[in-house]
Amino acid sequence: MAACGTAVIAPVAGIVLEVTRTDTWDAKVNAGATRGGLSWSILGDDGIRYYGSHLSAIEAAIQPGVRVTAGQRLGKVGRTGDTTACHLHFGISPACTGAGDWWIRRGVVWPWTYLDAWRKGTPKSPASAVSAWQREHGCPKKPLTNP
């Protein structure tokens, strides 16, 4: 968990794919597409999609199609969408359609191995794990399980 308001930075250089600036999640509907609240996704220069959600704010300059650099501020940790505590949901996945495939975008490989390595300054790429997942699953057109 991270404290509310903690800066969220780009994990890699790349192009912004999606930005959600309005929290439309409703517990009565519980739609998977809106569970992340305020969120962003980036297609990294490594060909991997990175996703962050539950933010309280996203920087105005962060827009689809904009190039970001590793370490660039994207927003602030919050508790929008389907959550009660402040935290950043961080997903790593293949780019697939690039937009609209929330069931993939929210992450298909466990991110901690990479987050821990990056925190220590070790350049560890999730590319092989993401490629292995995609070889097995492809790019599903709908959620594989009940969201």
PLM features per residue range, with description:
Residues 6, 46-48, 105:
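Short acidic/polar mixed-charge low-complexity motifs
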Residues 63-66, 91-147:
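Acidic, glycine-rich catalytic/binding loops that coordinate metals and/or anionic ligands
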